[in-house]
């Protein structure tokens, strides 16, 4: 099947957001794919796997259903303003805090999981 890429792009530019959202869902259903961004695999960088890790990055991979509570928790943990905290929660996966000790990382993880977020430590 031949198609003109420029014609399709022009048609998409004219479509409403609702129509585009419906189109994405239909494509996902038809082809069994997801429009979600892929998450990088942990541990791909190598390094000393047997050694104890000194610092951890706390990454929120899912914000959960209670986004307002997640935003409040992120603000409390990071000291960020409302807009920045909301940006982290809305754009998961996102690193909440970098280079923290294991104890602090686990405390942050517990706080975020308590409000329904899914968190990984890297």
Curated annotation (Swiss-Prot):
Keyword Ribosomal protein included in the entry's annotation: yes
List this protein's GO terms for biological process: translation
Does the UniProt entry include the keyword Transmembrane helix? Answer: no
List, alphabetically, the Pfam families matched: Ribosomal_L12, Ribosomal_L12_N
Please give the superkingdom of this protein's source: Bacteria
Q: What would be one Gene Ontology cellular-component term for the protein?
A: cytosolic large ribosomal subunit
Gene Ontology molecular-function annotations: mRNA binding; structural constituent of ribosome
* Gene3D superfamilies per UniProt: 3.30.1390.10, Single helix bin
Alphabetical UniProt keywords: Ribonucleoprotein, Ribosomal protein
InterPro entries linked? Ribosomal_bL12 (IPR000206), Ribosomal_bL12_C (IPR013823), Ribosomal_bL12_C/ClpS-like (IPR014719), Ribosomal_bL12_oligo (IPR008932), Ribosomal_bL12_oligo_N_sf (IPR036235)
List the NCBIfam families hit by this protein, alphabetically.
L12 (TIGR00855)
User: How does it associate, per the subunit comment?
Assistant: Homodimer. Part of the ribosomal stalk of the 50S ribosomal subunit. Forms a multimeric L10(L12)X complex, where L10 forms an elongated spine to which 2 to 4 L12 dimers bind in a sequential fashion. Binds GTP-bound translation factors.
Q: What does this protein do?
A: Forms part of the ribosomal stalk which helps the ribosome interact with GTP-bound translation factors. Is thus essential for accurate translation.
Recorded family membership? Belongs to the bacterial ribosomal protein bL12 family.
* Name of protein: Large ribosomal subunit protein bL12
Tell me what organism the protein belongs to: Levilactobacillus brevis (strain ATCC 367 / BCRC 12310 / CIP 105137 / JCM 1170 / LMG 11437 / NCIMB 947 / NCTC 947) (Lactobacillus brevis)
């Amino acid at each position: 099947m031949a198609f003109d890429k420029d014609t399709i792009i022009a048609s998409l530019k004219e479509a409403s957001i609702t129509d585009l959202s419906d189109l994405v869902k239909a494509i996902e259903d038809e082809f069994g794919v997801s429009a979600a961004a892929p998450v990088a695999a942990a541990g791909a960088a190598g390094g000393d796997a047997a050694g104890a890790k000194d610092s951890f990055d706390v990454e929120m991979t899912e914000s959960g259903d209670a986004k307002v509570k997640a935003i409040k928790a992120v603000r409390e943990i990071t000291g960020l303003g409302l807009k920045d905290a909301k940006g982290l929660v809305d754009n998961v996966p996102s690193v909440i805090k970098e280079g923290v000790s294991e104890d602090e990382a686990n405390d942050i993880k517990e706080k975020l999981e308590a409000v329904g977020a899914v968190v990984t430590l890297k």
